């Protein structure tokens, strides 16, 4: 799975936002979603395999946190996509005016 496919999934993006500034246990992350723990665990595995989150063990708990360096190469691509969408929005607004 390429990097864009990894971050294209809405729940994975939400997980990245949750662990952007702090470590969270897998159970704490799962508690914030309306899907099963195994489903969230699978998303965490995809993020970990892509290198977007780091995981460390604390006893029996796994703590997850974003690896910002790994997300760095995505930034220019995401900014381009964002700017294209904003340009389209501006064009639509101008057409309506």
Listing of model-derived features with the role each one plays in the protein:
Residues 2-36, 62-72:
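N-terminal helix-turn-helix DNA-binding core of bacterial DNA-binding proteins
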Residues 3-8, 55, 83, 92:
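Catalytic cores of transferase enzymes with a strong primary signal for eukaryotic protein kinases
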Residues 17, 21, 72-97:
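Amphipathic alpha-helical dimerization/coiled-coil segments
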Residues 31, 42, 48-49:
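Alpha-helical residues within the helix-turn-helix
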Residues 44-45, 74:
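Conserved active-site alpha-helix within GNAT-family acetyltransferase domains
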Residues 48-59, 65:
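Beta-hairpin "wing" of winged helix-turn-helix
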